């Protein structure tokens, strides 16, 4: 029988392996995603972010890093988590169905050149899929954070979008990588804005 200590140690070991596997395929796309967001922000655009459950928390975490700060003081950056307005979420969900809670907000707030960050560990979340469709209708760019094989979202992205797919089967490890990717993108954005990299 495995002890609790061994279980915890196994989580650390698996998390390290998952990050090492992700590093092999995600460094360049992460830079591309950060550059896409920088281009948007420097052209007075905004970033909209969405996801469900833990991915909703990641969307909010990302928006907070942008509007507040990541690690260094800098100007505020326009980012909105579409997961936080309970009145909008419940009204849209009640009147149109849960699949449309993000897409209706994307159509209301998104403009050409803006960026949607859609987060789904499976790549198959119906309301994130609808948000991606709405973003494309608005001529927005999409950065998709997914896992496993990327799901339906990976298949619907355009050449001008960026896929950050964590090639790992376990949801917890995908989520840990998603927050790492979010922090890495925030760092890239800050390094360009503050240090001119």
From Swiss-Prot:
HAMAP family: GmhA. Pathway: Carbohydrate biosynthesis; D-glycero-D-manno-heptose 7-phosphate biosynthesis; D-glycero-alpha-D-manno-heptose 7-phosphate and D-glycero-beta-D-manno-heptose 7-phosphate from sedoheptulose 7-phosphate: step 1/1. This is Phosphoheptose isomerase. Its EC number is 5.3.1.28. Homotetramer. It is found in: Cytoplasm. Keywords: Carbohydrate metabolism, Cytoplasm, Isomerase, Metal-binding, Zinc. GO terms for cellular component: cytoplasm. It catalyses: 2 D-sedoheptulose 7-phosphate = D-glycero-alpha-D-manno-heptose 7-phosphate + D-glycero-beta-D-manno-heptose 7-phosphate. One of its GO terms (biological process) is D-glycero-D-manno-heptose 7-phosphate biosynthetic process. The keyword Aminoacyl-tRNA synthetase does not apply. Belongs to the SIS family. GmhA subfamily. Substrate binds at residues 52-54, 65, 94-95, 120-122, 125, 175. It comes from Neisseria meningitidis serogroup C (strain 053442). One of its GO terms (molecular function) is carbohydrate derivative binding. Pfam families: SIS_2. The keyword Isomerase applies.
